[in-house]
């Protein structure tokens, strides 16, 4: 369909098995009021997770959640490792661990940790940050300079012999710029359609426009899925001990 020609490449799934309706980013969510009171600049690098000033002010999801996994992979990457060479990630976590107050296991618990003032900084999704900001709570989202990890809202028709043509049409409908704008405003999803126009207050909270979309990085899920069980056991021994 012609609509697929105006989508960002990052939403295209290899083998055309599905497509991303939009995307969110994993990066820093921080309490702007707290940072302002302290006179701190917004965080800008993954390695700042180890900054001693954040002692017991940091919340990170467990590795069983996607955001915690992204932390490990990105710390490996920015310290000379990768998904296939994860040791630098665990090594970097040794310096991060003293800063971690809690490992909230769900979005609700992460929101609670931030809203209670127990923590002032976390690694979280841009969409989650939008939802929290929409309540009036003073948070902002930062794309680390080395890249924020993209997380897609994927969609595909059910593969069956009598699949309705309407399923494809419904997916294509969702890529119309005006519908993409609704996804951005209500769900915090960065628009897949390059021609989508967003209101400034929405645009600043989602991955939007060539500059921000270019800051998104994808992780290698094929490698991660093979190693995840081992990494989880090691994380529980070394990080969440």
What are these regions (language model features)?
Residues 46, 110-111, 129, 167, ...:
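Short, hydrophobic alpha-helical packing/hinge segments within bilobed ligand-binding/sensory domains
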Residues 1-115:
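Extracytoplasmic ligand-binding site segments that recognize negatively charged/polar headgroups
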Residues 29-34, 74-78, 152-164, 182-183:
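A bilobed periplasmic-binding-protein/Venus flytrap-type ligand-binding module shared by bacterial periplasmic
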Residues 115, 120-138:
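A ligand-binding cleft/hinge motif common to bilobed small-molecule-binding domains
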Residues 9-16, 131-143:
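Ligand-binding "clamshell"
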Residues 90-96, 103-104, 135-159:
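Periplasmic-binding protein-like
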Residues 214-241:
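Conserved C-terminal helix/tail region of periplasmic/extracytoplasmic solute-binding proteins
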Residues 158-216:
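Mature extracytoplasmic/periplasmic domains
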